[in-house]
């Protein structure tokens, strides 16, 4: 059995602050479950161009608000209780809400190692 808290993760290299967001990597590749679970806080008034070339991601919003935009310009508001899935390694814009952070539980397959970090200075977007 594996039991962890957000507090436990904050003292490790599995707590990642990449500027526009923080991510607690609660379950990672070394745990051997075949997927990873992250608690992610997307900061209000931020925009990140992202793409997961090596992972599929499903996100469930547990608090706040924000939006995700695909590369065709379709914008999807995300609020508590909403889910979005990047099932085709979709490049996307992730935005925190205008007044609120967006809080997500993210599932990655295959799992993250836990120390991946976005690099937002690349105009083509951050990938891993």
Curated annotation (Swiss-Prot):
<dbReference type="Pfam" id="PF06339">
    <property type="entry name" value="Ectoine_synth"/>
</dbReference>
<comment type="similarity">
    <text>Belongs to the ectoine synthase family.</text>
</comment>
<dbReference type="InterPro" id="IPR014710">
    <property type="entry name" value="RmlC-like_jellyroll"/>
</dbReference>
<comment type="pathway">
    <text>Amine and polyamine biosynthesis; ectoine biosynthesis; L-ectoine from L-aspartate 4-semialdehyde: step 3/3.</text>
</comment>
<comment type="function">
    <text>Catalyzes the circularization of gamma-N-acetyl-alpha,gamma-diaminobutyric acid (ADABA) to ectoine (1,4,5,6-tetrahydro-2-methyl-4-pyrimidine carboxylic acid), which is an excellent osmoprotectant.</text>
</comment>
<keyword id="KW-0456">Lyase</keyword>
<dbReference type="GO" id="GO:0019491">
    <property type="term" value="P:ectoine biosynthetic process"/>
</dbReference>
<dbReference type="InterPro" id="IPR010462">
    <property type="entry name" value="Ectoine_synth"/>
</dbReference>
<protein>
    <recommendedName>
        <fullName>L-ectoine synthase</fullName>
        <ecNumber>4.2.1.108</ecNumber>
    </recommendedName>
</protein>
<dbReference type="GO" id="GO:0033990">
    <property type="term" value="F:ectoine synthase activity"/>
</dbReference>
<dbReference type="InterPro" id="IPR011051">
    <property type="entry name" value="RmlC_Cupin_sf"/>
</dbReference>
